[in-house]
Amino acid sequence: MGEIQAIRGTKDILPAEVGYWQWLEETASRILGTALYQEIRTPIFEQTQLFERGIGEATDVVGKEMYTFLDRRQRSLTLRPEGTAGVVRAYIEHKLQAAGGVQRLWYKGPMFRYERPQAGRQRQFHQIGVELLGSDDPRADVEVITLASEILKAVGLENLKLDINSLGNAQDRQNYRQALLDYLTPYKADLDADSQQRLEKNPLRILDSKDEKTKIICENVPSILEHLGSDSQKHFERVQSLLTDLGVIYNLNPCLVRGLDYYTHTAFEIQSDDLGAQATVCGGGRYDGLIAQLGGLDTPAVGWAIGLERLIILLQQKQSLSFLVPDFYLVSKGEKAEARSVVLAQQLRGLGFSVELDLSGSAFGKQFKRADRAKAVGCIILGDAEAENGTVQLKWMATQEQISLTQADLLTQAGELKAQISRHKS
């Protein structure tokens, strides 16, 4: 039997990379916490009909990309291709709307789509997302947009570009549908096969086509912004006004429709030139009809999702993993010293230091080389003599300065040692 490897489109996240993920997730959690968003965790698989009804059967996601299977009771289940539908299902099932007011939720975790794997895009991929449920106020749209921008800036993204559009309400889209048909029908033979099928079912989806020829045809389509009713127009104008008040630069993109059918009114994407062809790092919008469509009360909502794989690529290029550098590397030689090293390492960790304990039992010279490779700030040296008299040797690796101090002082001078570690790291 040949070697068993990870399935194409999936990726092992190895220890050297996990630190980036943890830092990114912790940064997002901290920023979302300042706006009182609460984390929600939903199952990785759901009933298939949740996504068919929620995302839309005419979308690429439902039609081509979902991982769907029958369980032993012949129920059709699907690995979640996105996070919003599951959050909405939980919101309805657990009657979260009964609490009244606005619910601010966020999630993180893996999603699954059968797409062509490439850099920053896997078949199992990860997202952080937010959902603000219970408000149709344009301020809600702006709140989630600015939170996304704040997170992206906090993790080092530069050259951000915000594209916004309005998809209006159901009546607006019905009016626009006819204008689209009038424009696109003469080009039907030149459209890609998928777009030809969508022409009658859902022509708005054609604007989301990735086919180059179809994209050229769509460059001169009528703008949906010219077909908005007065209420939709007022909502979108208010969103733009609030963004301007905040100093947020945005670009009106009337071809921005997103890839999922549940979007209404405001739709947006945040892109970064730092990521080249895969420039979109965050996408979202308002989905005022989805909760009622899935059996809940008529409840407005808005949200977004950030794809983590693309951000991780950028972080690896821009950020050093200084948070994975041990404060101390503890070397020991001799039976008594090795026994004492276990206790000392645990005591230091209890004081908040990161400590790597050398377990090799090899000569001090080899242990010192491993301390160098670990990029430790300090090396604590413990031989049998030190174990006997209650001392240690502390060597600062950057300067090679070495001092002798008692083990008691090492533990009681934690504040001073942390200050020295900070100076050596900077």
Swiss-Prot record:
Task: State one Pfam family annotation.
Answer: HGTP_anticodon
> Record's superkingdom?
Bacteria
Q: What class of enzyme is it?
A: ligase
Which GO biological process annotations does it have? Answer: histidyl-tRNA aminoacylation
Where mainly located? Answer: cytoplasm
Its GO CC terms are:
cytoplasm
Nucleotide-binding among keywords: yes
Keyword Cell inner membrane among UniProt keywords: no
Q: Which SUPFAM superfamilies match?
A: Class II aaRS ABD-related, Class II aaRS and biotin synthetases
Quote the EC number.
6.1.1.21
Any one GO molecular-function label of the UniProt entry? histidine-tRNA ligase activity
**Per the record, what are the reactions this protein catalyses?**
tRNA(His) + L-histidine + ATP = L-histidyl-tRNA(His) + AMP + diphosphate + H(+)
Q: Where in the cell is it found?
A: Cytoplasm
Instruction: Write out the entry's keywords from A to Z.
Output: Aminoacyl-tRNA synthetase, ATP-binding, Cytoplasm, Ligase, Nucleotide-binding, Protein biosynthesis
Family per record: Belongs to the class-II aminoacyl-tRNA synthetase family.
Subunit (UniProt): Homodimer.
**Any idea what this protein is called?**
Histidine--tRNA ligase
Species name? Microcystis aeruginosa (strain NIES-843 / IAM M-2473)
Q: Name the encoding gene, please.
A: hisS
